[in-house]
Amino acid sequence: MESMTPISCPTTPRWNQDRPFLTGRFHQETRASSKFADSKRFTLDSSSSGVEQAIGCYDTPVQELIVIDDLLSALVGIEGRYISIKRFHGKEDSIAFQVDPSMDLALQELAKRIFPLCEYYLLIDQFVESSSQFKNGLVNHAFAAALRALLLDYQAMVAQLEHQFRLGRLSIQGLWFYCQPMMGSMRALAAVIQQASTKQFVGSGVLNLLQSQAKAMAGDNSVRSLLEKMTECASNAYLSILERWVYEGIIDDPYGEFFIAENRSLKKESLSQDSTAKYWSQRYSLKDTIPGFLANIAATILTTGKYLNVMRECGHNVQVPISERSKLTIFGSNHHYLECIKAAHEFASIELVNLIKDKYDLVGRLRSIKHYLLLDQGDFLVHFMDIAREELNKKVHEISVEKLQSLLDLALRTTAAAADPRHEDLTCCVDRASLLTTLGMHKDTDSNSIEDPMSITGLETFSLSYKVQWPLSIVISKKALSKYQLIFRFLFHCKHVERQLCGAWQIHQGIRSMNSKGTAILRSSLLCRSMLKFISSLLHYLTFEVLEPNWHVMHDRLQSTRSVDEVIQHHDFFLDKCLRGCLLLLPDVLKKMEKLKSVCLQYAAATQWLISSSIDINSQSHPQKTMIRDTTVTESIFNFEREFNSELQSLGPVLSKGSQAEPYLTHLSQWILGVSKE
């Protein structure tokens, strides 16, 4: 059963229900409340000597005249002298006509053939009255109006038959003859009405019921045509709502009958705060019951109005031009209404895409995000990491985000990024968990990989964010930005590891003049070079094998898109592919990479001590102490080398195994294996 959305609607006046003379119920109720209440005696003339006579007391020709007179009344729902209405309480709309059992059997049989038509009329008439109340919705109002027009024709036919009867030209066989053509149509309408009343159908439910009944009557052209006419009349009000939606983007639905629901609690501002991007998918949504003739195009109708609404909220009040609008009708040649809806959808799609691309420069905004969050232009980041080193080395709970923001602004203003007017939309943030922990909220990861929160520094949790205004937030939503941030955090930490190893390499280069052949310094230098080659290979893979190619694919696709949904689809596909290509959706590979980076950082931090110890060893004159200390330094370097090579070699099989399902890992595997063979 379809229920209407609880929307305030006008109340039917009490006097319209309490006064039967306004509805015609007095014809049916006055006699039922008097002498026909319990047991009824049939009389011919109430002014006779008080003796009530049954119809069987009269001759057959007289009985026929009396029966015809009563049948003409029964055809419009009024009891006669010898024909009464029996109502069965407990069964909704259950009524039956009865005759005086003393009536001639032939006349009884003919009368009973006409009784169904009388019952159908009563049922339809009651439905017309009840459905005309405000609460039943526009579709029921329109359906009731069409039925009322049909009943007027029916009543005109009864009036003509009565005229013939008064002229003495109508027999009971003639009455049956004239009633037969209406029997099938009234039966079909009564069946529809009974089902609609029982299940309390409104809106789409009524239209679907009418259409299904029309299809079921395919063998009876006249009945099918009538039901199709009723469907067309009932759908006019519904199509008026549809027209405003696809042509103006407005839901003018006072009784909640339309198949598109609006969630007013969701605001456009939520796109920059809600990580699930509910606004675009749930602000307007499809209800369960959709008219059958619109089922295949319901999604198109939904997006058409959504596009027009987005433009309206941008202050760009665009409507489908009057010259391009056509009256939507269900029945017609070649389903003209489908062509109208598709034309309106194409217009709204192109207008919104052009608005976002041209006025709001979507591609330029995406390119700006690529510069900063995907490190396409990293000069500002180098400067920032230099001036923010002290703050980033603090524990997470000790970091001042305000200070980091000031340092970020300084780095942006003093580098090439200052020429970009969008750099002011860049902000910094510090997460409370490591990258593995953050990803663990979405993916199953080993609990051993989750680090102690107290040991995490800003270097593992620092990230950038980007202010995105409406309507670009439809495409670059909070959910999309969170994906950018995951990629940025991984790249940022890789850059940090590379900088630390470069510092260690510079220390080694500073002592090249020393004779280090066969010493721990030489071994340390080779290890540093291998580590630097590893992290450089990883960054090269991330940048040139993953981010750049996927960016160009997305950029090319955006040039030919014709709807915002396609734009969102291409952008989300780009981000998901980058996340997977950057190993962030592959826990086994990512944990190996994090372990290797951790070893590199530990080695880089120990380099100063290792080098200074090696220099001191060469300058000392006590052989025994020199040997012990040299052994300690050499053993430390061996431990770093052994751990690094072990992790690197174990990464190879993981990448080879993963490359069967993820072919792009083959490129990374080639780089990594190249490092391990050196």
From Swiss-Prot:
Name of the protein this chain belongs to: Gamma-tubulin complex component 2
Source domain of life: Eukaryota
Pfam families: GCP_C_terminal (PF04130), GCP_N_terminal (PF17681)
Subunit note: Part of the gamma-tubulin complex. Gamma-tubulin complex is composed of gamma-tubulin and GCP proteins (e.g. GCP2 and GCP3). Interacts directly with GCP3.
InterPro entries: GCP, GCP_C, GCP_C_sf, GCP_N
GO biological process terms on file: gametophyte development; gamma-tubulin complex localization; microtubule nucleation; positive regulation of microtubule nucleation
The keyword S-adenosyl-L-methionine belongs to this UniProt entry's keyword annotation: no
GO molecular function, one term: gamma-tubulin binding
